[in-house]
């Protein structure tokens, strides 16, 4: 069944991995855009606090990504009900699997990953740094998927998987086809712990952003090359120009007191 709760969870899990590439250019760029357009000097003169500014920038980006994911979700739901679809591969429409997929995949992944990308691009003012992080976290997730194939590593991989795929696999790896077609996703135990771990990391990152961010800060830069030292030599020694001042005749006679 292609629209079973199990199939939909896998579909939205893959969607979360693809949408993450939008984060640097939507969520991360919200503060960077102010510096790039040199509008920050004007914006920072307004009477808002640092917290208000960061929350507005972060959640405005989250809202835009939410709209994109919401429209994709509507497209998926409508696609299963278009004329010509094979009824043998479909079950009756049920809103709960969509809601579960949003709660366990889309929202947590968006918040914690968005917070990290937001912080990286904000402090480096470099969108490329955000994309590098996206690639790194996808590599990490791929490593954990491979690591979790061994039975003794399943629990560790389930807890550390940033997208929650291995946490779902922890409970559903040995499901039969009938169970995959009929049962809802088990939101319990290890799955909840995984989501809480990464939401906590995202929250901690945002708190760090708030603590470190300053309206007058300079961008953080990273370089593995040692910069050549430059010697500055003062070259204007003896360059003082002599000026002939007009001569003044001083008079201390008594008649000056009557002028």
Which residues does each predicted region cover?
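Secretory targeting signals
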Residues: 1-25, 55-127
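Helix-loop-helix units of permease transmembrane domains in multi-pass membrane transporters
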Residues: 29-64
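Terminal transmembrane helical anchor/hairpin motif
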Residues: 2-5, 85-93, 128-212, 216-220
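Cytoplasmic membrane-interface regions of multi-pass membrane proteins
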Residues: 36-39, 117-120, 218
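Hydrophobic alpha-helical transmembrane segments
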Residues: 1-34, 58, 62, 74, ...
């Amino acid at each position: 069944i292609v629209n079973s709760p199990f199939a939909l969870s896998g579909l939205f899990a893959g969607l979360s991995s693809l949408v993450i590439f939008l984060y640097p250019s939507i969520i991360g760029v919200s503060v960077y855009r102010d510096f790039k357009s040199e509008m920050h000097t004007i914006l920072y003169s307004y009477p808002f606090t640092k917290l208000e500014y960061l929350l507005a920038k972060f959640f405005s980006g989250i809202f835009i990504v939410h709209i994109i994911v919401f429209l994709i979700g509507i497209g998926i739901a409508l696609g299963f009900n278009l004329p010509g679809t094979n009824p043998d591969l479909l079950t009756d429409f049920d809103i709960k699997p969509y809601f579960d997929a949003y709660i366990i995949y889309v929202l947590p992944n968006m918040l914690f990953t968005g917070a990290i990308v937001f912080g990286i691009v904000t402090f480096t003012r470099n969108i490329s740094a955000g994309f590098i992080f996206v690639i790194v976290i996808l590599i990490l997730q791929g490593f954990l998927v491979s690591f979790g194939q061994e039975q003794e590593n399943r629990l560790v991989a389930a807890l550390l998987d940033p997208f929650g795929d291995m946490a779902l696999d922890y409970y559903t790896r040995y499901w039969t086809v009938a169970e995959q077609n009929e049962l809802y996703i088990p939101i319990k135990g290890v799955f909840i712990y995984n989501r809480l771990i990464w939401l906590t990391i995202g929250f901690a990152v945002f708190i760090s952003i708030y603590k470190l961010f300053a309206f007058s800060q300079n961008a953080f830069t990273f370089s593995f090359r040692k910069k050549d030292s430059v010697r500055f030599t003062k070259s204007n020694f003896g360059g003082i120009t002599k000026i002939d001042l007009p001569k003044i005749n001083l008079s201390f006679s008594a008649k000056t007191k009557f002028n």
